[in-house]
Structures are given as C-alpha cells and as structure tokens.
C-alpha cells in the first residue's frame, strides 16, 4: 500500500486543458470519487480542484494500475483523450507523493509562490472526502502532516506576505497598467471567496469598487463586510457596466463563459479585463479595439518577478518540506511500533492473570498472597520486556521496520487489528 498523487497543474497543462479537467460542483466531485474507489486497488481518495490545478490524492495497492484507472475515469469525465492526459500527468508515489503534497500545501507548487488560498482549498477538499467517507486513517495522517508542514513554512519564511494570490496578482497588474488608481472604477463579477479577495486588494490599491453577481443578496452581504463603501449593482446592468468601467475582474464558478462575443459590448475607453476563473468566464474569441483580456496564465510576468524575489525564502521552505517528509515516514513507523510494544505488555498481563488464577485454583498459592504475587510477576515481565521494547522503538527509525512489525506480531500472536485501529484526528484541520 502506497500514497499516490496524480497532478495536473499550471506546470504541465495550459488553461484550455485545465478548464476541461475542472470540477465545478460537489456533485461532480462526489461522483468521480465514488468511481475511482469502486475498484479494489484505490482505498482512500481526496480530489482537489482549483483554478490552477487538479490533484487526486490516494492510497493504492498498485500504483501503475491505479494511475491508469484514475486517468481513464478522468478522461471520460473531461472528454479528453486518455493518452493526452497520461502524457501530461505528473504521477507521484510513496515518498515522492508525500513530498509533492507537502509542497502543494505549503504553496511552493503554486502559480504564485506563497499564495495563501491553497491550504484552505486543500482543507476543504479533505473535509469533503472525510464527510463522504472517502478517506480514513492513512489519508488523515498524511493530511495532518501536510497542514503541519504548511504552518511551519508560513512561520519560518515570509512567503505568505506581499502579492501572494492569483487575485492579488491580477490587481497588481491592473495597478501597474492604470498608474494612479484614485477614483478609477473597478468591477468585480462574482461574490465568492476569490471575489472577496479581489475586492480586498482593489480597495487596498485605491480603486472605486463595484460588485455584480447573479445572487445580488450575496453580493450585498460581501460588500457589507468592508469598512469602505463598495457599490453593488443588479446583474442585468452587467453590459452597461462593461462599457463604462476600465477595470473588470471576473471570478465566478460558472461552468461556461458568461461574457461572450454576443454580449460583450464595445466602448470608446481603454478597458482591461482579468479572467481569474477556471473554467474561464470570458470567451477566448472576444477581440475588439481598446480592450485587453488577461487570463490566469497571462499573469506570468508578475509571477516570475514574484518567484525571483522569493527565491531564497522558497529554498528555506523546500528544506522544511524535505525534512517534514522524512519526519512523516519516521512518525508512521513509530505509530506502527508503539501499539505493538503496548500489546506486548498487555499480553504479559494476560498471562500473569491466567497463571495466578490457575495457581490459586490448584492450591499452589494462597489467595491472600495473590496481590503480592501479581506485583512480583508484573515486575519480572516489565524488566524482561524493557530491552526488547527499547530495541523495537529504535528499529522504528530503520528501513526494516515493516518486516520487524510482522515478525513480532507472528512470534507473540498479537492481534494485528489492534495495531491498525489507531484512528488519528487531524489537529490542523480546524486551523486557518
């Protein structure tokens, strides 16, 4: 059994392919996770789908077979040829899968190094699979350590400061284009988490912000969370606002373009539209004078600047990821050893109990001496097992740990199930 991660991201796929791979609803995610868990080789699974990546995180009995099965099902879902997906996919297993997952959680694999959204998105994906029963002990353990790693990276580096999200990068680009942002109108289409971040950065940059959404009530609630005044307009005014507003950033979860060649108006002013949604909100075929359209992949210049400024911090962060990956596997081995050590002592107590009762029954010892004899036997067992227990704990740091675990279980007839029911709570799940 090994960890397996199949990754499609901005590093190996363009936005056109990521649009087809994106999971836009919980229903789609639920159906896909059910499908990949139907076979006997994929045991637990999490699906992470964001504007820049689709990651399938699993435990598998057969890496090659499981990878092929998952990509086949993804090909059916996305209507993309299997060979195309298989050639593009980054497939990680065992320690490589853990290192990649920790890098993703720590925002080192993001389009914008150090962006702050990914760990929350990963927690949401984990919660979803937990609630549906699609992941249990093994995935919980690795996710716990992934969030622990991300927290250490944030604490030890300054990667979480500055322009560190797709939304903030889009706003930074808009600010570079406009120059003086005082009284410059900016329109945000959508009222979700990405839109909230966008509004926050637009306000901080001095723009006059308007929110528009199909759900006007949701837009009003979002606007009310800011200390400065944020305008809210009904959705039927979208076309009119697109004519008069120089900056527009759209981040809806619509599964299809909401701004098309048919409804995109022309204008006499210079306009700059930023589409940070995947699938894209703006039809890629729109082209007119005085209009520039930027997708997520078009923000690469700022991303490259971001990466060069953060290179030293990223080096420190990767060191943390590597160390935490090694610690994780050592921790896993210790979790396997500790229940065995405990069971050895329990087994000794069971034997003491059985033999003392039998001796009293046969008249070999007086019942009034039972407590003292138990104490003596327990002292003997404890002293006898002390060195083997210490050796077992030391062996947990070595590669032969798995072999030793099985051997000790067989030698002492220990119940294997008792060592595998150590359900682990993810302490970092409730933390932001």
UniProtKB/Swiss-Prot annotation:
<protein>
    <recommendedName>
        <fullName>Glutamyl-tRNA reductase</fullName>
        <ecNumber>1.2.1.70</ecNumber>
    </recommendedName>
</protein>
<keyword id="KW-0627">Porphyrin biosynthesis</keyword>
<feature type="binding site">
    <location>
        <position position="121"/>
    </location>
    <ligand>
        <name>substrate</name>
    </ligand>
</feature>
<feature type="binding site">
    <location>
        <begin position="115"/>
        <end position="117"/>
    </location>
    <ligand>
        <name>substrate</name>
    </ligand>
</feature>
<comment type="pathway">
    <text>Porphyrin-containing compound metabolism; protoporphyrin-IX biosynthesis; 5-aminolevulinate from L-glutamyl-tRNA(Glu): step 1/2.</text>
</comment>
<dbReference type="GO" id="GO:0019353">
    <property type="term" value="P:protoporphyrinogen IX biosynthetic process from glutamate"/>
</dbReference>
<dbReference type="InterPro" id="IPR018214">
    <property type="entry name" value="GluRdtase_CS"/>
</dbReference>
<keyword id="KW-0560">Oxidoreductase</keyword>
<dbReference type="GO" id="GO:0008883">
    <property type="term" value="F:glutamyl-tRNA reductase activity"/>
</dbReference>
<dbReference type="InterPro" id="IPR000343">
    <property type="entry name" value="4pyrrol_synth_GluRdtase"/>
</dbReference>
<dbReference type="GO" id="GO:0050661">
    <property type="term" value="F:NADP binding"/>
</dbReference>
<feature type="binding site">
    <location>
        <begin position="190"/>
        <end position="195"/>
    </location>
    <ligand>
        <name>NADP(+)</name>
    </ligand>
</feature>
<feature type="site" description="Important for activity">
    <location>
        <position position="100"/>
    </location>
</feature>
<feature type="binding site">
    <location>
        <begin position="50"/>
        <end position="53"/>
    </location>
    <ligand>
        <name>substrate</name>
    </ligand>
</feature>
<dbReference type="InterPro" id="IPR036453">
    <property type="entry name" value="GluRdtase_dimer_dom_sf"/>
</dbReference>
<comment type="similarity">
    <text>Belongs to the glutamyl-tRNA reductase family.</text>
</comment>
<comment type="subunit">
    <text>Homodimer.</text>
</comment>
<dbReference type="InterPro" id="IPR006151">
    <property type="entry name" value="Shikm_DH/Glu-tRNA_Rdtase"/>
</dbReference>
<feature type="binding site">
    <location>
        <position position="110"/>
    </location>
    <ligand>
        <name>substrate</name>
    </ligand>
</feature>
<dbReference type="Pfam" id="PF01488">
    <property type="entry name" value="Shikimate_DH"/>
</dbReference>
<dbReference type="InterPro" id="IPR036343">
    <property type="entry name" value="GluRdtase_N_sf"/>
</dbReference>
<dbReference type="InterPro" id="IPR015895">
    <property type="entry name" value="4pyrrol_synth_GluRdtase_N"/>
</dbReference>
<dbReference type="InterPro" id="IPR015896">
    <property type="entry name" value="4pyrrol_synth_GluRdtase_dimer"/>
</dbReference>
<feature type="active site" description="Nucleophile">
    <location>
        <position position="51"/>
    </location>
</feature>
<dbReference type="Pfam" id="PF05201">
    <property type="entry name" value="GlutR_N"/>
</dbReference>
<comment type="function">
    <text>Catalyzes the NADPH-dependent reduction of glutamyl-tRNA(Glu) to glutamate 1-semialdehyde (GSA).</text>
</comment>
<keyword id="KW-0521">NADP</keyword>
<dbReference type="InterPro" id="IPR036291">
    <property type="entry name" value="NAD(P)-bd_dom_sf"/>
</dbReference>
<dbReference type="Pfam" id="PF00745">
    <property type="entry name" value="GlutR_dimer"/>
</dbReference>
């Amino acid at each position: 059994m090994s960890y397996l991660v199949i990754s499609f991201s901005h590093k190996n796929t363009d936005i056109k392919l990521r649009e087809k791979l994106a999971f836009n609803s919980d229903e789609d995610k639920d159906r896909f996770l059910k499908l990949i868990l139907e076979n006997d080789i994929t045991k637990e699974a999490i699906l992470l789908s964001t504007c820049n990546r689709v990651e399938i995180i699993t435990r598998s009995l057969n890496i090659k077979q499981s990878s092929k099965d998952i990509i086949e099902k993804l090909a059916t879902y996305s209507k993309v040829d299997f060979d195309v997906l298989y050639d593009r996919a980054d497939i990680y297993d065992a320690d490589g899968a853990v290192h990649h997952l920790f890098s993703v959680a720590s925002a080192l694999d993001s389009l914008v190094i150090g962006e702050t959204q990914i760990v929350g998105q990963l927690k949401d994906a984990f919660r979803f699979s937990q609630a549906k029963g699609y992941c249990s002990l093994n995935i919980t353990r690795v996710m716990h350590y992934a969030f622990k790693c991300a927290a250490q990276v944030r604490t030890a580096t300054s990667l979480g400061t500055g322009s560190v999200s797709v939304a903030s990068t889009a706003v930074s680009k808009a600010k570079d284009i406009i120059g003086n942002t005082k009284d410059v109108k900016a329109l945000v289409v959508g009222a979700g988490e990405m839109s909230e971040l966008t509004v926050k950065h637009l306000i901080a940059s001095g723009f006059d912000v308007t929110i528009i959404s199909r759900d006007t009530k949701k837009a009003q609630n979002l606007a009310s969370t800011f200390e400065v005044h944020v305008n809210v307009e009904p959705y039927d005014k979208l076309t009119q606002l697109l004519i008069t507003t120089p900056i527009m950033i759209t981040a809806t979860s619509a599964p299809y373009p909401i701004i098309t060649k048919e409804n995109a108006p022309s204008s006499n002013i210079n306009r700059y539209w930023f589409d940070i949604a995947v699938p894209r909100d703006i039809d890629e075929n729109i082209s007119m004078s005085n209009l520039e359209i930027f997708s997520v992949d078009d923000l690469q210049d700022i991303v490259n600047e971001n990466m060069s400024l953060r290179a030293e911090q990223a080096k420190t962060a990767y060191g943390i990821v590597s160390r935490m990956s090694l610690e994780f596997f050592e921790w896993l081995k210790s979790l396997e050893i500790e229940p065995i050590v405990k069971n050895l002592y329990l087994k000794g107590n069971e034997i003491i109990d059985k033999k003392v009762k039998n001796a009293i029954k046969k008249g070999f010892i007086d019942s009034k001496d039972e407590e003292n004899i138990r104490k003596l036997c327990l002292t003997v067992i404890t002293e006898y097992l002390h060195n083997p227990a210490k050796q077992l704990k030391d062996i947990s740091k070595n590669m032969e740990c798995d072999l030793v675990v099985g051997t000790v279980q067989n030698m002492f007839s220990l119940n294997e199930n008792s060592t595998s029911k150590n359900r682990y709570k993810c302490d970092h799940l409730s933390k932001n």
